[in-house]
């Protein structure tokens, strides 16, 4: 029987097939843990007298609540006592149960969905879970990456399994070659605008087509990362030579004969030619351009060349009311060209766009320039390793000379759970993944953008792409 990529990975991990509508029991290959969704899970283990089932398949890092400045301060000196408590609790739980932890200040600390791939822990054909919705990131490797809740975190810690009902499958085909300046972030924002924030509900999305195959692994991670914003449980890309080249030589990747055997298996992880998807969506990648959001959900986006929608032109009452509410919160008027929207802050970071390629791309835009006087710019690498690599390449110097704030690794301004937050009414061009009301701080207004658009926006002070910029003025004349 012909099968899709998702079905192959699923079938390879069924420990017990569900009967009479019951869920299947899946084996979990990798469990990633952080400080926010794990405390009650460890409490449950402790109360039941259970150990962690597979310490070798469990790894923890501190990311959501971590400060991105003054990281050497004791946790007791953090202003947010809830954050300090969660970080301290994770350290105590990992020490008690023997879980490997990369804490603040560790050479491998960082956002969990950056750390896993860079260590080579995420590999094709795996099942990967974490108490975080953006675990879909790991599907870029041809793995089944799923966000889970705290009770499920406890179940995996205790049994290394998870009961789940099979998902439907949807093919997202992006044909053609992307134009210069159009990135993976623009592709996924366009996909979400096309199918809506609920369009993927109940599905695993498989991204296919020439435009997807031509992406780097970091670009594929950006795409899969935001599958959840389309309502999907997971997103996947079939592994290929790009995948293998990224993984080879990483600390936890197979070595020697084991590598050869792994690659042989990984090559089988592709959708069969005659397999059928439950739904299919096709986009012309060559027609895509830089994309930005205007509203309060990731599906409320338009090309940068477009304008804010005009509610009076929308016939559906429910849709019109939703647009009106979003515009009121965002402080925007219908019909405003997107390029006329001024921002107060630019944030480059998050598990969506904080990897070395993202930082290189943004640095190339701002090199030799100065930021707009009206804008503050915050650049937060996704991991300590990414930060060190960027500094070795001189990228930190480029950002500092531009006038940006160069920070330590963490989730930072992606979410209002640490000191990096927007003030009420403050408008931000952000490379993160969610623009909900209050996501980056109470009353904060978020426009989701690519690193290229973020960098150009920081130069002009209004939503912009690199094509909008004049050549930088030479500094040696």
From Swiss-Prot:
Pfam family, one: Aconitase
Stored InterPro entries: 3-IsopropMal_deHydase_lsu (IPR004430), Acnase/IPM_dHydase_lsu_aba_1/3 (IPR015931), Acoase/IPM_deHydtase_lsu_aba (IPR001030), Aconitase_4Fe-4S_BS (IPR018136), Aconitase_4Fe-4S_dom (IPR036008), IPM_dehydratase_rel_enz (IPR050067), IPMI_cat (IPR033941)
Pathway assigned in UniProt: Amino-acid biosynthesis; L-leucine biosynthesis; L-leucine from 3-methyl-2-oxobutanoate: step 2/4
One function term, GO molecular function aspect: 4 iron, 4 sulfur cluster binding
Encoding gene, per UniProt annotation: leuC
Reactions it catalyzes: (2R,3S)-3-isopropylmalate = (2S)-2-isopropylmalate
Known partners and oligomeric status: Heterodimer of LeuC and LeuD.
Function description: Catalyzes the isomerization between 2-isopropylmalate and 3-isopropylmalate, via the formation of 2-isopropylmaleate.
Record's cofactor remark: Binds 1 [4Fe-4S] cluster per subunit.
Cofactor(s) the record lists: [4Fe-4S] cluster
Protein known as: 3-isopropylmalate dehydratase large subunit
């Amino acid at each position: 029987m012909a099968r899709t990529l998702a079905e192959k990975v699923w079938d390879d991990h069924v420990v017990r097939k569900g009967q009479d509508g019951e869920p299947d029991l899946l084996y979990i290959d990798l469990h990633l843990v952080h400080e926010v969704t794990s405390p009650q899970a460890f409490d449950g283990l402790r109360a039941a007298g259970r150990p962690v089932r597979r310490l070798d398949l469990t790894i923890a890092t501190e990311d959501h609540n971590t400060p991105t400045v003054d990281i050497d301060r004791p946790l007791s000196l953090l202003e947010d006592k809830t954050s300090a408590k969660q970080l301290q609790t994770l350290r105590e739980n990992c020490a008690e149960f023997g879980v490997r932890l990369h804490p603040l200040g560790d050479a491998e600390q960082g956002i969990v969905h950056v750390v896993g791939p860079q260590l080579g822990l995420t590999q094709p054909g795996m099942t990967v879970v974490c108490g975080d919705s953006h675990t879909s990131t790991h599907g870029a490797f041809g793995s089944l990456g799923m966000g889970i809740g705290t009770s499920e975190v406890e179940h995996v810690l205790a049994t290394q399994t998870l009961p789940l009902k099979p998902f439907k499958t949807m093919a997202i085909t992006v044909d053609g070659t992307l134009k210069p300046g159009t990135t993976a972030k623009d592709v996924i924002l366009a996909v979400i605008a096309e199918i809506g924030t609920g369009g993927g509900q109940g599905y695993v999305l498989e991204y296919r087509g020439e435009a997807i195959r031509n992406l780097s692994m970091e670009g594929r991670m950006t795409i899969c990362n935001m599958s959840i914003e389309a309502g999907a449980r997971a997103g996947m890309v079939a592994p290929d030579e790009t995948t293998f080249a990224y993984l080879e030589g990483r600390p936890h990747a197979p070595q020697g004969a084991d590598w050869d055997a792994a690659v042989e298996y990984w090559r089988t992880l592709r959708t069969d030619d005659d397999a059928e998807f439950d739904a299919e969506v096709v986009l012309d990648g060559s027609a895509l351009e830089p994309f930005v959001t205007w509203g309060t959900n990731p599906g409320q986006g338009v090309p940068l060349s477009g304008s804010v929608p005009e509610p009076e032109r929308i016939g559906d009452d429910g849709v019109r009311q939703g647009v009106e509410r979003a515009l009121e919160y965002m402080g925007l008027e219908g019909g405003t060209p997107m390029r006329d929207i001024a921002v107060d802050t630019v944030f480059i970071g998050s598990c969506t766009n904080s990897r070395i390629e993202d930082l290189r791309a943004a640095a190339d835009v701002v090199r030799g320039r100065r930021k707009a006087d009206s804008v503050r710019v915050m650049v937060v690498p996704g991991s300590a390793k990414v930060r060190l690599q960027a500094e070795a390449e001189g990228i930190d110097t480029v950002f500092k000379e531009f006038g940006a704030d160069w920070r330590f690794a963490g989730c930072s301004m992606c979410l209002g759970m640490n000191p990096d937050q927007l003030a009420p009414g403050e408008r931000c061009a952000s490379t993160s993944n969610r623009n909900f009301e209050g996501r980056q701080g109470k009353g904060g207004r978020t426009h989701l953008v690519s690193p290229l658009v973020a960098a150009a926006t920081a130069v002009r002070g209004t939503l912009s792409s690199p094509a909008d910029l004049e050549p930088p003025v030479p500094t040696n004349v």
